[in-house]
Amino acid sequence: MAFYGIFFFYIIFWTAVVSPTPILNRGYIPKTNNIDFTIEKVTLAPDGFTRQLSTVNGQFPGPTIEVNKGDRILMKIRNKLGESTAMHAHGMLQRGTPWYAQCVIPDDYEFTYNFTVADQVGTHWYHAHETMQYVDGVFGALIIHDPDDPFKSEYDEEIIVMLNDYHHTNAQILLKQFLTPEIPDNGLINGKNNFDCSKAPPGSKCVDNAGLAKFEFVKDKKYRLRIINTSAFSAFFFSIDKHDMEVIEADGLYTKRNKIHRLPINVAQRYSVIVTANQPVDNYIMRSEFQKTINLPNIKAIVHYEGAPDDPEPKDNPWSDSLTEYVDLDHKTLQPLEEEKIPESTKKFEFKIDFHKNSTGVVKAFLNNSSYIPDINFPTLDKIFKKKSFNETSANAYIFDKDGEVVDMYFINSDDGEHPFHIHGYQFWVLGTGNGDKVDENELNTHNPIKRDTATIPASGWIAIRFVSDNPGAWGIHCHMICYRFIPFLFIILFFFDKFTNIFFLYFHFIFVLRGM
């Protein structure tokens, strides 16, 4: 443990040097938020079915982190899982940490992430980024409040709504059983739902009517719902019976108002919507409908108006029954609240996504006929620091050596399933999506496209994105349907080594040695 103390010192020293100082309006003084998390296994029954979950501070979902723009976060992770772990703040750049490319935190060790949220706001989440731990419960909401929120005067309260598919089997067992999406046993809203215990395996401990999540509304008040899809595999349609919604945020970025009835939300995506409590005082169903081929009942919660009697089972009245034409959010109509002139592209890549058996008969993901092969003995960053060459094909590594390059990436999906993909360390403009195996460049929106960190590649279709290479590092791009990380649907983008090898060498050398202890 003596060596670990030295290792920890260098993390704190380095982060204090490089974290930027934010500039804020309205006289807000940034502060340091000390977050203390213990990751451990606890036996719980969120839907009435008892099983062991991996939890944050014994809670499922984990505690919400709420800070303000400009604040510093010191997030200490104590690992008591009995296995290694790592934590990722999804959607956050996390400048001042090892970001995504870190070695794991061994069992019975602790690690402190130290970063400043200088220029990001909005709805995010944190989750384990080791094997399938977040499927077992290691996740929670991370909210960055904005002192200059342009919509602040238009809602009275905020409510966090976390959606997820849910398995009664430990995720590590699931991983051994499949490398394709699995039908979940249930779905939860804020960690709650009922389950039909007649479907539980013999010998299981299960209680019917475990109870639904309950959200308190006051007549005529307006609510900002921060909606997060923390699923392993499942996309949803989110709605509240009799209440329409106005979208104002997507993945931490403000949008122009978009009035809808149902919100399609894919894995790892986040939205904020404003809902007005303008219906008669009563109880209403909040619902999250599984998309596509998953034949499970709607996930439900209760919206309870102040003054209404308690009702554990409000009457079902979905938009599909009450309207002949209801409006689902079309992501193509999303526009940033403030227009942004985007630069012209200077480099272009096209990636064809396939899934087929490799030479050993195992189904793998291939990007341009190459499948990512991790080098356990020589991690990516260690290769960079030691000036080793890359086998770019087997590593699925793409190297950018110029600061400020404007990169277009086209993803062509030959699979009959959609893929929500995420880029670490970057946000990107979504220029367009479509069907077929060829990008229609005439249809690309280069005038005022939405910016995101998680977007959907359509089934048998394509997506075109653009970003500026301005964040040095080794970053992963991967499908956020978690089983595809083990096929693996993953590749690495490497940005201008000369800007970070000398600064990071000692820091990551300690991480590498610690991993080998």
Model-identified regions with their sequence ranges:
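Cleavable N-terminal signal peptides of Sec/SRP-targeted secreted and luminal proteins
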Residues: 3-20
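Signal-peptide-cleavage-adjacent N-terminal segments of secreted and extracellular proteins
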Residues: 17-80
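Extended terminal and domain-junction accessory segments
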Residues: 20-36, 132, 136-174, 255-418, ...
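Divalent metal-coordination and catalytic microenvironments
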Residues: 37, 75, 87, 122, ...
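Extracytoplasmic beta-sandwich strand-turn segments characteristic of Greek-key/jelly-roll folds
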Residues: 56, 60-67, 73, 89-119, ...
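Asparagine-centered strand-capping/turn motif at beta-strand->loop junctions
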Residues: 77-81, 227-231, 410-415
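Acidic-aromatic/histidine active-site loop/patch
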Residues: 157-222, 228-231, 356, 364-365
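Active/binding-pocket-proximal capping segment
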Residues: 241-255, 414-447, 482-486, 494-498, ...
